[in-house]
Amino acid sequence: PKGDIMELKRSSGVLLHITSLPANEGIGTLGKPAFEFVNWLKAAGQKYWQVLPIHPTGYADSPYQSPSAFAGNPLLIDLWELVELGLLAPDDIKGREYGEDPSTVDYEKVIAQKKELLRKAFFSFKEDVSYLAFIQEQSWWLEDYALFMAIKQHNELRSWMTWDKELRFRKPEVLAAFKEEHIEDIKFHRFVQYMFFTQWNKLKAYANKNGISIIGDIPIYAAMDSADVWVNPKLFTIDISLRPTLVAGVPPDYFSPTGQLWGNPLYDWDAMERDGYNWWLSRIDHAMKLYDMVRIDHFRAFDTYYAIPADATTAEYGEWKKGPGMKLFDTVREKLGDVNIIAEDLGDIFDSVKKLLSDTGFPGMRVLQFGFNSEGKDSIHLCHNYVNNCVAYTGTHDNDTIMGWLKSADAKAAKMAKSYINANFLEHKNVSFIRSVYASPAALAIIPMQDILGIDGRGRMNVPSTVGGNWTWRMKKPANKKSARLMNKLATAYLRKPSVTANAKDK
């Protein structure tokens, strides 16, 4: 049976990652500006706030390469909340060097300052009942993660694959000895997670109370250098010497002649099935507690996934293998009931992927920017071709902003776009793009904040397959009443505004 996700009501939302919120401490956090953004969303007639993965960032500061599929990102913790709790003094936070430019995140500086301040707060912290309840409730992932991070710290943050053999292979007596010797470091990571989830839960409760639902994001693969792979190597394509045998990526295409080599280990789906898909059930269940709805990245891999030999230097010589398909989602529905999932089904997908999507009943994604390619009016990404059960975007975190794209697109595509959105001199072009997506049959329309603000390519969040300079864009100041009025007007005009009764009912 298909889930009640099919009842996605006509509505709209905004894509803005937490790190992009304005703040004086170099990075957006779960503090006051996040609560103010919820107020802005409400005033703007919106129903959803979509964020990128909120897990700790690892390689190249990407939220899609995390040392944990379950932990929260310490960089998102609001330091001023720690002042209110008496764990820090205002002077501890003020006058530090968090980075010069208020419109970007300087990760190196932010990480150095936050690490020091969180340590300082930890030394003042006294364990209480709610802390003890948290570490008990979350022990199923938290203990492994805290231990993993503590060992990593004592190995100069090097990958676990370079650790001493006994630690790599998780010899119980060696782990027990390490725990005993470094218990304070382990407790520090528990404390940081407690603070993160306390703040996250407070923000989510405030959003829900104000009729705003949060859409999260699950990266499809775990990072090789993660607690998840270190603890569960048998669930991945990892051999007995703990080396990957097959890794993830996508084959060559028009944009990328040698394909994309992501390097994450793949899932051993046979082992996962024997285990009752327990790891994925835990992951989706955890996400459903964190968010109201969740986007699963690279959804096509559940049908067919591309497997590349681990020693390959490009993605040219991989092969397609069969994923778990409906077996996984039937198990999810049986164990967790109906779950609100958005399937990221972008790119060149097989008919079997379309069938899986249809069998699950999950909405897929459409991106207007992709509509102005060589397919002309038949492109599924042009608004008139949208189905009702989909989530439509002007662009995602992997696209240029609308204004950036208009400048860099080839003349033919830009001309087609301007004609399609009926760009005229009465409103800014970014607004015409938003209007087109809002007017479409898509049940849910999500607009990146950069496109609402009409920011050029400097607001781009990520350029796929590049390292460095990504994930850094920030709003210099909070969104204003003028932009809220504009979005409210569009949400009202295109029947996407939540009715007062619907909001009351959702509570």
Can you describe what each PLM-predicted range is?
Residues H189, Q193-A222:
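Conserved, well-ordered alpha-helix/loop/beta-strand core segments that scaffold catalytic motifs
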Residues E7, K32-T57, K289-Y291, V437:
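Catalytic domains of carbohydrate-active enzymes, especially glycoside hydrolases
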Residues M6-R10, L15-H17, A23, D61-F197, ...:
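Alpha-amylase-like alpha-glycosidases and glucanotransferases acting on alpha-linked glucans and related
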Residues P1-I5:
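Short, Lys/Arg-enriched N-terminal segments with co-localized hydrophobic residues
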